[in-house]
Swiss-Prot record:
Its main location: cytoplasm. Coiled coil: none annotated. It comes from Sus scrofa. Changing D42A: Strongly reduces inhibitory activity. Belongs to the PP1 inhibitor family. One of its GO terms (cellular component) is cytoplasm. GO terms for molecular function: protein serine/threonine phosphatase inhibitor activity. This is Protein phosphatase 1 regulatory subunit 14A.
Length: 147
């Protein structure tokens, strides 16, 4: 019996409204923000795009290891999706990677496969300092990195 009471007490603390408070003590702030985002955009699509962006960042770091200064500022997924064919996308990606001394063929082919499942999301872009309307992966990481 005592174990049941203890279990109920722990469970009630985990479910208490004070645990659901968002930043600044507002109840459910984080939960409500997710709800608004997923109403406008499909959450699964957003997660897929994020996964592709993380994959691109990781692979670029591998390809340019030791030569980070030569790394392209960005690989804009929306620009690639706007192109008509995979051949055009492939040429665009290869143009971005022209300074890479490591083999890039596998990266290009894998990225083309990952792009097949994505759709252009024009509302997701935020203005960049360069004024072209997009953030580079490096700029985005710097903007969202913890202090």
């Amino acid at each position: 019996m005592a174990a049941q009471r203890l279990g109920k007490r722990v469970l009630s603390k985990l479910q208490s409204p004070s645990r659901a408070r968002g930043p600044g003590g507002s109840p459910g702030g984080l939960q409500k923000r997710h709800a608004r985002v997923t109403v406008k955009y499909d959450r699964r699509e957003l997660q897929r795009r994020l996964d592709v962006e993380k994959w691109i960042d990781g692979r670029l770091e591998e390809l340019y290891r030791g030569r980070e200064a030569d790394m392209p500022d960005e690989v804009n997924i929306d620009e690639l999706l706007e192109l008509e064919s995979e051949e055009e996308r492939s040429r665009k990606i290869q143009g971005l990677l022209k300074s890479c001394t490591n083999p890039t063929e596998n990266f290009v082919q894998e990225l083309l496969v990952k792009l097949r499942g994505l759709h252009k999301q024009p509302g997701l872009r935020q203005p960049s300092p360069s004024g072209d309307g997009s953030l580079s992966p490096r700029q985005d990481r710097a903007r969202t990195a913890p202090p």
